Amino acid sequence: MSVDSIRYKSYNNVIDTLKCIGEKHLNIKTVTSGDIWTIDLEKNTLFPLFHINPVNVTVGLHQRTFNFQLFLMDLVEPDSSNEQEVLSDCLEIMNDIIAIYKHGEILYKFNDEAGEEDRYFINDDFTIEPFTEEYDNAVTGWVMSFAITVENELNTCNIPIDNTTICVK
């Protein structure tokens, strides 16, 4: 395994890592990704639900920042009697996700060439906003903007292009 395959992460790596964290968290029952309007909130969906909504990617000379909206939601009783409890539980799970990216050993792989080093970088502070929606089920939870920065290399040496001719016209 080359050092580059460890350091430079693709969109697939970033999404799959977020999904894995959600799938391994013992309090999350369903993990989905894609546009927020594609969430299936039918009565057969298992909750709490963790949804990853891609927003955009910012590419810089040495880094790529993947911007997401992360949703964590659970069912609310028809009379909303458990809304405070649901909000509290979902907020703790959101806090867990931040903690895993800040300090979680499951995001590190030791490699003799690269050593143990961060592969994913996140901000220090997050604003997490509550929401309530009524579909087939009434759900409440939290949404936060979550930016994941990874190393990037804008290197023309590895581009699969026929460079036998110059493209300047």
Where in this protein do the model-derived segments appear?
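Small/polar-rich, solvent-exposed N-terminal microdomains that initiate assembly or binding
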Residues: 1-63, 109-114, 158-159, 169
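Extracellular/virion structural assembly segments
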Residues: 2-16, 61-65, 72-105
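Ampiphathic alpha-helical segments that act as solvent-exposed interaction surfaces
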Residues: 21, 86-90, 139
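Secondary-structure boundary elements
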Residues: 24, 151-153
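Acidic-leaning, charged glycine-interspersed low-complexity segments
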Residues: 41-46, 91-150
